[in-house]
């Protein structure tokens, strides 16, 4: 009966996620006054961020080096507007709000500036130094970096107090989370205005501290790395993905890496490898060097046709051990992330991982899943995995601390 369903663990977890979503939306202390956004970089992320802001009613200028680089972004924007806006003239009006500005002539009118160029620190710093003198007072200067520390990127800024991370996720139109990353110099006013801006454009803000990989990429990296290690041991790619999907993940780690882009995955992995204590897999480097970057090039670990990976239909079914390897290494890193102070509390951590990665929503998030499975069970399972596969599975001390609070 419906009454029985209401009291199931799954139902309670989904209700919990509803309230976590409302908590994120409620983080804005006041409505955003932002009306104009300038995005630098018209690649997949920059172009789609610009289109999303225009869809939400803001005036947006999009800058890149040439019109040829901007045209694909405009095509994707038109598709987005036509699919989302059905009222007569609404899609055309949104297209008019999205303007090309190759020279950055209108950057001085923007309330929010978002940098979304390639993950090269020197190039990002040079760009900031070039346009910072032209920015309005009290502007929000955001970088969409996926994992580079803000201290490194903010060197040389005249007003580092206005600088922070605004990390959107791909695909922008589908994933609701934006990590709002505070650097050492970011002031409260900028942080609060950035949170309000994220809410204004219909996204969920996750405040976090600048740390390698921030929240989402930090917990995803060991999950994807474990998948590649399992593949090197002889597990089929399809078996690995099926193990994660059987747990409840929307996409397996191998397909996820292909969809994120293997070049992006490599950038993140190189930044995080020291933190995680896991070397960058040679297989990942080889794929990138060969130009096989995943879905965007039509080939990565899988071959893609019509944006769908071609997977073998017959493969070995995954065993519970493989599922635990993938999920528990993610859980362990999530705990490390919290203990390092990257997020304020465990509820925010759960919200960030679910809304940023699609982590099995019915579990309520990684920490909620650990509580319901049993923290002591998680610790013992991690110890067993550490004996079999190495110290990357050694239980983080935070698990024992969590037991004392239950």
Please place each PLM-identified region on the residue numbering.
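N-terminal glycine-rich phosphate-binding loop for ADP-containing cofactors
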Residues: 1-406
């Amino acid at each position: 009966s419906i009454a029985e369903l209401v009291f199931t663990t799954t139902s309670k977890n989904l209700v919990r996620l509803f309230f976590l979503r409302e908590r994120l939306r409620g983080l804005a202390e006041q409505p955003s006054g932002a009306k104009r956004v300038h995005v630098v970089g018209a690649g997949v992320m920059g172009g789609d961020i610009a289109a999303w802001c225009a869809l939400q009613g803001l005036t947006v200028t999009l800058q890149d080096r040439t019109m040829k680089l901007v045209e694909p972004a405009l095509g994707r924007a038109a598709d987005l507007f036509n699919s989302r806006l059905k009222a007569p003239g609404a899609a055309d009006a949104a297209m008019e709000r999205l303007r090309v500005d190759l020279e950055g002539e209108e950057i001085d009118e923007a309330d929010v500036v978002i940098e979304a160029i390639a993950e090269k620190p020197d190039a990002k710093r040079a760009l900031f130094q070039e346009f910072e003198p032209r920015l309005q007072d009290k502007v929000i200067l955001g970088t969409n970096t996926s994992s580079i520390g803000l201290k490194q990127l903010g060197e040389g800024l005249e007003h580092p107090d206005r600088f922070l991370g605004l990390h959107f996720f791909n695909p922008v139109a589908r994933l609701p989370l934006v990590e709002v990353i505070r650097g050492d110099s970011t002031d409260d006013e900028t942080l609060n205005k950035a949170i309000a801006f994220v809410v204004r454009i219909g996204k969920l803000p996750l405040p976090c501290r600048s740390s390698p990989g921030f929240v989402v990429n930090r917990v995803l990296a060991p999950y994807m790395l474990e998948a590649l290690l399992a593949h090197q041991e002889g597990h089929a790619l399809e078996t690995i993905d099926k193990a994660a999907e059987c747990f409840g993940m929307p996409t397996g780690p191998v397909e996820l890496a292909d969809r994120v882009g293997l070049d992006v995955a490599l950038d993140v992995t190189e930044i995080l490898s020291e933190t995680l204590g896991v070397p960058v897999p040679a297989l990942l480097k080889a794929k990138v060097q060969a130009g096989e970057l995943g879905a965007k090039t039509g080939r990565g670990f899988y071959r893609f046709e019509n944006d769908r990976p071609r997977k073998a239909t017959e493969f070995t079914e995954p065993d519970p051990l493989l599922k635990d390897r993938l999920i528990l290494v993610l859980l362990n890193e999530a705990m490390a992330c919290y203990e390092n102070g990257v997020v304020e509390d465990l509820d925010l951590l759960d919200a960030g991982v679910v809304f940023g990665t699609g982590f099995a929503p019915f579990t309520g998030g990684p920490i909620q899943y650990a509580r319901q499975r049993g923290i002591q069970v998680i610790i013992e399972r991690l110890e067993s995995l550490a004996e079999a596969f190495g110290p990357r599975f050694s239980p983080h001390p935070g698990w024992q601390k969590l037991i004392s609070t239950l």
